[in-house]
Amino acid sequence: MSEVLPAGLATTVLVPASSANLGPGFDSLGIALSLYDEIEVNTTESGLKVAVEGQGAGEVPLDGSHLVVRAIERGLAAGGAAAPGLIVQCHNKIPHSRGLGSSAAAAVAGLGVANGLLAKAGRAVLSDDVLVQLASEFEGHPDNAAASVLGGAVVSWSETSGATPIYAATRLDVHPDIKIVAAIPEEQSSTAHTRVLLPQAVTHVDARFNISRVALLTVALTARPDLLMTATEDRLHQPQRASAMPASADVLAYLRSQGVAAVLSGAGPAVLALTTVDLPDSAVKYAEDQGFSLVAMAVSAGVSVR
């Protein structure tokens, strides 16, 4: 039976955006980015109040179906607790439906809130492994969720031997010379919409190509950033998604033509540039002329709770 937490507990969570795939690492590689949603939560005697400002305001539900609320409840249940009532305030900076992990961030934020409340009540908190598992259950894949939990870059995987998939990840420390720039358009795109564009089968040649590139990318991210251009080549999902987001495909191709290791961020439409030098002025102008906002980011250390 769950213990009902007292009213008057408060916690604040800062959760980072993330980018998945990074070119060849489809549904397995991710990286945490220094763009954050901040969630403030108080326990009350009863009821639920949800407020959202910034990204998603006026678009997301303000009741118990809100993903942050569902994740809070799931995390508390995993910790053997429940809240009598909640005030949830979301200050969102992560753009929605752009390929920057906004839904994974919401799930991780809610679980982080649960950990904060459990800690304030003197109860054991959930481990990082449990956070990755629970957040990935909301997502259906672990790449974004694991990055937001663990920070840095992540290699993630799943095992499906039982009824419930087991999700796991390990962190990679990103080379300090690597700089990240996100090119973010106004248009939105959902993962579900672009995932249906992917073929059910690929050739052995293309599979072998991507295996070599994703292995190389783990080296490029951690020790050899000079290999990023080759390491970010992909044949499994970016070419297939190009028709659904021609502007993103165009910007990605132009950046790569200028020697910039650019990839589609998750399912897009944002484009991520991984580089050790500033972007060429011509690349900046080209992306901005196509309606993209360029945002310089660092690698995040992951979710923080206070």
UniProtKB/Swiss-Prot annotation:
| A molecular function GO annotation | homoserine kinase activity
Q: Which residues form a coiled coil?
A: none
Output the Gene Ontology cellular-component terms. cytoplasm
GO biological process, alphabetically ordered: threonine biosynthetic process
Which reaction is this enzyme known to catalyze? L-homoserine + ATP = O-phospho-L-homoserine + ADP + H(+)
* Keyword ATP-binding included in the entry's annotation: yes
- InterPro entries named in the record: GHMP_kinase_C_dom, GHMP_kinase_C_sf, GHMP_kinase_N_dom, GHMP_knse_ATP-bd_CS, Homoserine_kinase, Ribosomal_Su5_D2-typ_SF, Ribsml_uS5_D2-typ_fold_subgr
> Pathway listed for it?
Amino-acid biosynthesis; L-threonine biosynthesis; L-threonine from L-aspartate: step 4/5
Asked if the record carries the keyword Ribonucleoprotein, the reply is no
Regarding protein family, the annotation reads:
Belongs to the GHMP kinase family. Homoserine kinase subfamily.
Please tell me where ATP binds in this chain.
Answer: P95, H96, S97, R98, G99, L100, G101, S102, S103, A104, A105
Q: What is this protein called?
A: Homoserine kinase
Name the gene that codes for it. thrB
Question: Which Pfam families does the UniProt entry name for this protein?
Answer: GHMP_kinases_C, GHMP_kinases_N
Q: What species does this protein belong to?
A: Mycobacteroides abscessus (strain ATCC 19977 / DSM 44196 / CCUG 20993 / CIP 104536 / JCM 13569 / NCTC 13031 / TMC 1543 / L948)
Keywords, A to Z, come to: Amino-acid biosynthesis, ATP-binding, Cytoplasm, Kinase, Nucleotide-binding, Threonine biosynthesis, Transferase
